[in-house]
Every structure is written in C-alpha cells, then in structure tokens.
C-alpha cells in the first residue's frame, strides 16, 4: 500500500508535530507530556477544564476538538489504542483551574480503565475529575444494555455541547449533566464499504468483499450487524436513518441535529448524496432538522464508509450547539 509515511512506527508522533504546527493559534503540546495536546489558553481561569482522549487514526478526532469553547486538552494514544493513564492524568492537571475537570470520552475498555486510574491519581493531588462516556453506537449493543455501547461520531456533539456549557460558566456538575443529556439523546450507525489498514501492519485488518457492505461496522473494524449486498445510496441512507430513529423513538415534531461523517476515504460528494435521503426520511417521520454537519469528523484511517449521528434537541441543547466554538475539527 502506498502512503505518505516516514517510519510507520512513528507516524503518530509525526502527525502530532504537524497538527500542532498547523494549528499553533489554537493548540500546543503539554510541557509535562508529549502525548498531551492542550488549548493555548488552558487552563482558563474560573472555568471547568475539559479533557478527551483516544486512539489515533480517527482524525480530526480527538486532536481536532481542542480549541476555543471546546476541549481544553486531549490525551493521544497510538493508532486504535487507548492513551495511557499517565497521559490522561497529565491532561487533567494541565487544564485544572480549581473548578474541576470533566473528562468526556468514548466507551471503550482501555479508555475506561485508564481514565479511572488517572482520576484516582488526580484525586490524590486535590483535583476533582468527573466523566461521561459516549455510548451512541446503536450496532454495538441492544437498547436494553445501552450503557455497553461504544462511542463513535456522537462524541462530537458531546464535546461541542459540554464545551459550550463550560465556556458559559457552568459548574462541573452542570457540565457533566448536560454532556450526559447529550449522550442520552444521541444515536449513531456506521456502514463500511472497504476496510482500513494500520500503517505499521501494511494490510487491511479485515475484509469486505467487492459488492458487499458491512452494516453497523465499528470504527476499528469491529464486526457490524451483518454483511449485505451493496445497495443504491438512497436505500443505504434510509436503512441507516431507520436504524437510528427506531432506536431513538423521538416524538413527532422533535427537532434534531444531524452529523454525517466520512470514515476516511469517502468523497464528501457521496456524504451529501446520503444526506439528501436521510433528511427526506427524517421529515417523513415528522422530525425537523435544526442543524447539519457534513464532512470528516470521526474517521477510521482509510476506511470507505459513513457514520450517521442524530441528536434529539431541546432548547438548552440548541443554545449550546449554536454557541461560538473554534477548533481544527469544528467551527461554529
């Protein structure tokens, strides 16, 4: 496979260096830990600190959501691997202004374990850290055990809304509460058309046959709900939207925000083709689309596919979603 790589074993380090140089007006590397990137103005006096983190390979997640009125720091892991507990701890300490720290991350075993270890270590230093995990992946666990679901593209809404609440002076508990409310009202589904390949491995870590698609695939290639024959885009879009709405069960007349993310190798043109039918389906269900985000928001290296995320809104979530924000991955 042909790639723009120096040494595959050091691609994350090279990427972080480039990211920080390109966005030096917003982010910088932590002096305490090279695997922590923080907002240039962090810690912000009088504000709850916000931290996220996760494995590399999902860019712009997670680096891209550090910035003004967004996350204050990110712990950076190797490709598809959790950041270390030390990286999370150093991220917490780098953004604490005395108001506590909210850690908002996706629901994966390694992240859960390392965040909890870091929280215990921070507590010994007198820093209070509370957390919320994104659990939006409808394909990863049944509705009855939603707390076991993985976090995928829905994390973007959690970061945007949590960041806005903190920027507006919310307390730690208020930030945690609104982040959890966002998670509780967010559902996502992914469809994969072709696999991804980790640079150091050099070949795909799973296969999708030509003419097939994997419905409900995970962001690391986790098996989906099933493998199906490839369909026209309008049929795929409707199947994705139906899967999300059937699980969410929003009341008729509800307003929603929609995020359509490519998975790394998907032309933006095709995301708009999908979205055209997604909105038509949502309107048929009596839903009103309030805000739309289309592009690469949470990817999976070079996987060809798409993620659909829907957030059911209320007045508070609408206000926070609209609040000014600027980071490499999103600007409002």
PLM regions: where:
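N-terminal amphipathic/basic leader segments beginning at the initiator methionine
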Residues: 1-50, 315-332
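Short glycine-rich or small-residue beta-strand-to-loop segments that form or flank ligand, phosphate
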Residues: 2, 48-55, 71-74, 100-109, ...
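Glycine-rich oxoanion-binding loops at beta->alpha junctions
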Residues: 58, 67-98
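Short, acidic/small-residue loops that bind anionic groups at enzyme active sites
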Residues: 74-79, 123-148, 285-289
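Short Gly/Thr/Asp-enriched flexible loops that form oxyanion-binding sites at enzyme active sites
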Residues: 112-126, 145, 270-276
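Short alpha-helices
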Residues: 134-174, 178-185
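Mixed-charge interfacial surface used for oligomerization/domain docking
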Residues: 168-273
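C-terminal non-catalytic interaction/assembly regions of soluble proteins
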Residues: 243, 248-332
